[in-house]
């Protein structure tokens, strides 16, 4: 199944039913009074988070949805039937945006969570409602109100505790295969990973966390080059970033250069994202002799002026991966305790999350606008070449994200 993480849809709530004008007409009853009933309310449109979904592909081709209208009122004071609500299932992690105002209507982050996106129209009133001491036979009714209608933009961000950053072929997919039961494709060419991969890492008997791998970043990614830029937004909700660096690149390049490329592209994409806690993970250490390994580790750390945690591992040989997984679990546990005990810390993290999402959305919108200009034949000197940008309209391949234990 193709992985689709952005769609635009139109939703229309049902209109309210009109009120009924009628009068009581029975044998032996003269001048029967009004008995027109009210109409029924229109059905509303809801989005509901469904843990069984992991892509928005269902909304790629069917994009218009309307709830049922309310029925008109009946005679003998019968109220019209209410229109049936329309419930649209979406994956957990979907952000709902009003396309007209760009206002975020809500985030569906828990299974079963429901969000009202279009309110059904109010019912019309029958003529019985207008009976009074001075007007015993009213001929007045009201029509039902129209239901809400709006264009929505749905954005899916995978929910993971830990996100992986790195150049193509840094060993991110191999690392996920090493620490979880997930089996993403691994090969010796760039961009083996085309969509986010998720794996559930079990630590001990009862604890686990979710780790996400996105397509590798390349130089110029913040300007649209490569595949990874569009998927950087999926790291907005992670709690920790692991920066994987290939310590033994086949082309003999300096690992510190590769690390600096990632930091530079991350800063240009979202300065707030660089404030997320990050750990440096130096991979493929098994391919170096001990002295050379120590020298390269020291060189990378000094070149980056890295102050945070550093782990030296071999994902292929599973060396150091267990210690890293345990350290991540401890970090996540301590973070959860601190959030519960320190309201200021929790609010600061929430504000950082909002800032990251705002910056990511603004940057991606800017890239979309540049692409639209190019398609219209308008060129800009400042805009970067976006020929390598992954275009969902042209890509019929893809895969679904699966949580695997």
Swiss-Prot record:
Sequence segments annotated as region (Disordered): 127-148, 373-405
Q: Which GO terms describe its molecular function?
A: GTP binding; GTPase activity; magnesium ion binding
Residues annotated as binding Mg(2+)? 173, 193
Give the subcellular location. Answer: Cytoplasm
One GO BP: ribosome biogenesis
Compositional bias (Acidic residues): 383-398
Which InterPro entries did the record assign? G_OBG, GTP-bd, GTP-bd_Obg/CgtA, GTP1-OBG_CS, GTP1_OBG_dom, GTP1_OBG_dom_sf, OBG_GTPase, P-loop_NTPase
Composition-biased stretches (Polar residues): 129-143
Where is GTP annotated to bind? 166-173, 191-195, 213-216, 283-286, 314-316
**Keyword annotations of the record:** Cytoplasm, GTP-binding, Hydrolase, Magnesium, Metal-binding, Nucleotide-binding
Primary subcellular site in the record, as a coarse category? cytoplasm
User: PROSITE patterns attached here?
Assistant: G_OBG (PS51710), GTP1_OBG (PS00905), OBG (PS51883)
Top EC class for this record: hydrolase
- Identify which cofactors the protein needs according to its UniProt entry: Mg(2+)
Keyword flag Magnesium: yes
Pfam families attached here? GTP1_OBG, MMR_HSR1
Give EC number(s), comma-separated: 3.6.5.-
Q: Where is the Obg domain?
A: 1-159
What CDD domains is this protein classified in? Obg
Span of domain OBG-type G: 160-333
Which is one Gene Ontology cellular component term of this protein?
cytoplasm
Which PANTHER family does this one have?
DEVELOPMENTALLY REGULATED GTP-BINDING PROTEIN-RELATED, MITOCHONDRIAL RIBOSOME-ASSOCIATED GTPASE 2
Family affiliation: Belongs to the TRAFAC class OBG-HflX-like GTPase superfamily. OBG GTPase family.
This molecule's function is given as: An essential GTPase which binds GTP, GDP and possibly (p)ppGpp with moderate affinity, with high nucleotide exchange rates and a fairly low GTP hydrolysis rate. Plays a role in control of the cell cycle, stress response, ribosome biogenesis and in those bacteria that undergo differentiation, in morphogenesis control.
HAMAP family tied to this protein: GTPase_Obg
- Protein name per Swiss-Prot or TrEMBL: GTPase Obg
Q: Which gene encodes it?
A: obg
